């Protein structure tokens, strides 16, 4: 069995800048888009964002800002092309 390795969040988020990510909020919604920027509080700016509720797309939102205290997790999305935003 392999153990989960701890990751320092700031370098991890900075490494995802310019790539497609999925961000799940504490309230159950998910947002997929290109991570444009992360600040020192770990607020997220996404471009080409799409909202998902219960796995169903609710539509395209464009550019959004997600406040840090709402985020449950952030991860890279495999199979998506990198985009300069």
Curated annotation (Swiss-Prot):
Provide GO CC annotations from the record: catalytic step 2 spliceosome; cytosol; pICln-Sm protein complex; U1 snRNP
Keyword Oxidoreductase appears in the UniProt entry = no
Using the record for this protein, list the coiled-coil segments as residue ranges, or answer none: none
> What is an annotated GO biological process for this record, any one?
mRNA splicing, via spliceosome
Q: Which CDD domains match?
A: Sm_F
Tell me where the signal peptide lies: none
Question: Which InterPro entries does this entry report, sorted A to Z?
Answer: Lsm6/sSmF, LSM_dom_sf, Sm, Sm_dom_euk/arc, Sm_F
Q: Which Pfam families match?
A: LSM (PF01423)
Gene3D superfamilies linked: 2.30.30.100
Q: Which GO terms describe its molecular function?
A: RNA binding
Q: Which SUPFAM superfamilies match?
A: Sm-like ribonucleoproteins (SSF50182)
Location within or outside the cell: Nucleus; Cytoplasm, Cytosol
Keyword Nucleotide-binding part of the UniProt annotation? no
The record ties this protein, via PROSITE patterns, to: SM
Q: Name the UniProt key words of this record, in alphabetical order.
A: Cytoplasm, mRNA processing, mRNA splicing, Nucleus, Ribonucleoprotein, RNA-binding, Spliceosome
Give the similarity note: Belongs to the snRNP Sm proteins family. SmF/LSm6 subfamily.
What this protein is reported to do is described as: Plays a role in pre-mRNA splicing as a core component of the spliceosomal U1, U2, U4 and U5 small nuclear ribonucleoproteins (snRNPs), the building blocks of the spliceosome.
The name this protein carries in UniProt is Probable small nuclear ribonucleoprotein F
Classification from the root reads: Eukaryota, Metazoa, Ecdysozoa, Nematoda, Chromadorea
């Amino acid at each position: 069995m392999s153990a989960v390795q701890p990751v320092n969040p700031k370098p991890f988020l900075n490494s995802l800048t310019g790539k497609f990510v999925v961000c799940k909020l504490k309230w159950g919604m998910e947002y997929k888009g290109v991570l444009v920027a992360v600040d020192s509080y770990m607020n997220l700016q996404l471009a080409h964002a799409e909202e998902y509720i219960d796995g169903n797309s609710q539509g395209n939102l464009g550019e959004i800002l997600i406040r840090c205290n709402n985020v449950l997790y952030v991860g890279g999305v495999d199979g998506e092309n990198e985009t300069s935003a």
